[in-house]
Amino acid sequence: MALARDPTGAEIARFIATRTGAQMVQLMRCIKEPAAQAAFTAKLLVAPPAMSGRPATPEKARKALNAFVGFRCYYITIPMFKPWPMKKLSNLIGLLWEADPNKSLWSLMAKPWSTIRDQIGKDQAPLDQFFRIICPHLKLPDPASYLEIHGWTLAVNEEGDPIISRSADSEFASVGTGNTDMAISVEDIITYGQSLGYAHGFILDNKPSSTFLGQSVSSTLEKNISAISITEGTSKAAHARFLIRNKRRAKRQTLRNAGYRASLDQDILNGHQLDPAPVDENMPDCYSTTAPVLDQSPNKFYGGLTTLLSDQISTGQGDADHLDNAYLFNDCSLSGNAPFMTIAGFTTNMPNLTDYGAFRLGADEDVTLPIFDDITHI
């Protein structure tokens, strides 16, 4: 028989760490003494958290901030840009970026913010707040004065879209540059930001950064001259693209209108059930459109038939005396079984028996035609 033994402290700790919340509540209820409950509660407070058997998924490395994205985030707040949505301003921001003389500073600022974000998270390191602190420190133009400082003019085209322009001989292209003639490192930017209360939770390591900026005034002037030429070429290219786009739109509209006209003509032809005239080089310029005239000369057969059916036949009793060998229709000497059409030489009132008015010229087309019941006796 196995002897009972007390569990070790490690076994008790492992048992407690693997219990659920409901099981822990049940254990607390089983402890009756207040002192024991207090000791057990204190033990739970310092106990290590339960380890899950599932391996932790390594966090994917985040992509560093792009210099142009930072530039756009800061200068999209230019007050004159407020009436238009972002999709209308993308081309303008691109033109400003191409001519901006401070690209190196924007590339430098992207590195410290990416480092801070990777350590403490994006929520604890707002990008717009970072630029509001660092850009004035590096003497970059603020959004409200950027266009004026660099000599840009904002206008609206015929379609209501914003456009910007700057003359090629503008004197403003060489101004508005930041502190590009002094050595600035990533650590310097982070330290300055933390001195103003930004990203207090970030811990700067002691390893020096290899990213810094140090340029002379001459290199800055060379860059500004290059920016002038780039701006001039970019403005001309943008204007040329604008003209080409309008020409394409006008051409598409012309084709669309021609299609509408052809469709309308076809609908008219279909409505009148007419076929378009054939087009052939061998077709004569003029052809006869006179319809053939039908032969309307009197026909003796049909004229006689109409007269026979429409003329009145003698109907009176006294009329029989005027005809040779004529009998009355009700003569007693006639056989009652003989059909009247086989009897020769009698007179009768044919119009009173059958209406032959349908055979008259110009008669009513709705008149009832006669029914020849004795046609089978012929």
UniProtKB/Swiss-Prot annotation:
GO cellular component term of the entry, any: nucleus
Protein name from the UniProt record: Mating-type protein MAT-1
Family of the protein in this entry: Belongs to the MATALPHA1 family.
InterPro entries found in the cross-reference section: MATalpha_HMGbox
Lineage of source species: Eukaryota, Fungi, Dikarya, Ascomycota, Pezizomycotina
GO molecular function annotations of the record: DNA binding, bending
Job description of the protein: Mating type proteins are sequence specific DNA-binding proteins that act as master switches in fungal differentiation by controlling gene expression in a cell type-specific fashion. Transcriptional activator that induces the transcription of alpha-specific genes.
Localization of this protein: Nucleus
One BP annotation, GO: positive regulation of mating-type specific transcription, DNA-templated
Primary location class: nucleus
Organism, scientific name: Cochliobolus sativus
DNA-binding region: 60-117
Transmembrane segments: none
Superkingdom of the organism of origin: Eukaryota
Keywords associated with the record: DNA-binding, Fertilization, Nucleus, Transcription, Transcription regulation
